[in-house]
Design a protein with these regions (language model features):
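Class I SAM-dependent methyltransferase SAM-binding "motif I" and its flanking Rossmann-like core
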Residues: 34-91
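Short, hinge-like loop/turn segments at secondary-structure boundaries
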Residues: 9-11, 35-38, 62-67, 114-115, ...
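A contiguous loop/helix-start segment that scaffolds small-molecule binding in enzyme catalytic cores
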Residues: 12-16, 93-178
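Helical mechanochemical/support elements of P-loop NTPase systems and associated helical scaffolds
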Residues: 3, 24, 31, 81-84, ...
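General beta-strand structural signal in soluble alpha/beta enzymes
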Residues: 21, 48-51, 97, 123
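Short gly/pro/ser/thr-enriched loop/turn and capping motifs at secondary-structure boundaries
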Residues: 26, 53-56, 129-130
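Conserved phosphate/pyrophosphate-binding and hydrolysis machinery centered on Walker-type P-loop NTPases
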Residues: 25, 29, 75-78, 97-101, ...
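Class I S-adenosyl-L-methionine
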Residues: 1-48
Length: 178
């Protein structure tokens, strides 16, 4: 927060700044929004130039429905994680999450517990790089591929979870035996 105050005073003294990131678009799943909010509250004009954002190409490559989606970003590491996974498991749209390669397998295991083995999902890694990979399958198949190293647990990871399907109502036929 001290950096925000320093940058704000720099801008207010008449200097221009540029907010850049080596991890995608600033403000998407990072604290860059704090600076942007402070600048806007101070009446500073903020302009955004389009740039790399991992979740858009991941959504396209996944083949999952893209007409409606929910961007979660990084899940909480500890506090509230299981509650959040329960909430996410009930969403009827595609859910997009970022995950560390070191927590990828655990995350898929947790998704299986909350969503079931057959929920469709996709792991996309290393977008726009030489080892780019997008694997869409059931959660249980994705876990199997992680266990056999068909999906390396390296690089930048995007997990896309298919939405919860509406339960089909089954008509019950009643018969009376006399």
């Amino acid at each position: 927060h001290k950096a925000v105050e320093h940058i704000l005073s720099t801008v207010q003294s008449g200097q221009d700044i540029a907010l850049i990131s080596d991890a995608g678009t600033p403000g998407i799943s990072d604290p860059g929004y704090l600076l942007i909010r402070a600048l806007k509250q101070a009446g500073v004009k903020v302009t955004c130039l389009p740039g790399p954002t991992a979740f858009v190409p991941a959504l396209v490559m996944s083949g999952l429905p893209s007409d409606k989606f929910f961007f979660e970003g990084f899940l909480p590491h500890k506090k509230g994680r299981q509650t959040r996974l329960t909430e996410i498991s009930q969403l009827p749209c595609t859910v997009i999450m970022y995950e560390s390669p070191f927590r990828l397998q655990k995350c898929i295991e947790e998704l299986i517990l909350h969503c079931g083995e057959e929920r469709l999902a996709c792991i996309v890694r290393e977008i726009s790089k030489i080892h780019e990979q997008a694997v869409t399958a059931s959660l249980s198949e994705l876990l199997s591929q992680l266990n056999t190293a068909k999906i390396p647990q390296k690089g930048e990871i995007v997990i896309l979870l298919g939405g919860k399907e509406k339960e089909k109502k089954v008509k019950k036929e009643h018969s009376i035996i006399v």
